[in-house]
């Protein structure tokens, strides 16, 4: 179970968070961001699933929260539901840490968001599944500032 990348984009396609776990050139990254947004943005939340076949035997698992799309690219053989829950877990941690997280929190506190992301995902794999453990680590990091 390895991630290729994690993207958080708004409805307009602006990338608010990008973490790459596979080597891509800058041109490929720009192209992938556009392709992922064009793939997930027009999908109907009520009648279509949160899993989309992608290229090179991968798939996009995504979840929309308000105006943000949280997308992960995984191998086609990986368990989609595990990653869907991992996305939800990440958003729950963000929500608890920032207190009702919004897009502006991601923009202005990007360094904290990346720290949270690194606590949950490490080297493209799910590292921590305990919300309390992650929040305790983040409290310790906050005290260092």
UniProtKB/Swiss-Prot annotation:
Nucleus in keyword set: no
Keywords: Cell membrane, Coated pit, Endocytosis, Membrane, Protein transport, Transport
Cellular localization per UniProt: Cell membrane; Membrane, Coated pit
Pfam families, A to Z: Clat_adaptor_s
Keyword presence, Membrane: yes
Classification via InterPro entries: AP_complex_ssu (IPR016635), AP_mu_sigma_su (IPR022775), APS2 (IPR027156), Longin-like_dom_sf (IPR011012)
Function: Component of the adaptor complexes which link clathrin to receptors in coated vesicles. Clathrin-associated protein complexes are believed to interact with the cytoplasmic tails of membrane proteins, leading to their selection and concentration.
Protein name in the entry: AP-2 complex subunit sigma
């Amino acid at each position: 179970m390895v991630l290729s990348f994690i993207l958080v984009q708004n409805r307009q396609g602006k990338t608010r968070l990008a973490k790459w776990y596979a080597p891509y050139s800058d041109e490929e990254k720009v192209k992938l961001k556009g392709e992922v947004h064009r793939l997930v943005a027009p999908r109907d939340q009520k009648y279509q699933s949160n899993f989309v076949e992608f290229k090179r035997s991968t798939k996009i698992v995504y979840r929309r929260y308000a105006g943000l799309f949280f997308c992960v690219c995984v191998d086609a053989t990986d368990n989609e539901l595990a990653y869907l829950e991992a996305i939800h877990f990440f958003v729950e941690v963000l929500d608890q840490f920032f207190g009702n997280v919004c897009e502006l929190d991601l923009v202005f506190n990007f360094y904290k968001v990346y720290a949270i992301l690194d606590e949950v995902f490490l080297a493209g794999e799910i590292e921590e599944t305990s919300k309390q453990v992650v929040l305790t680590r983040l409290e310790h990091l906050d005290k260092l500032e």
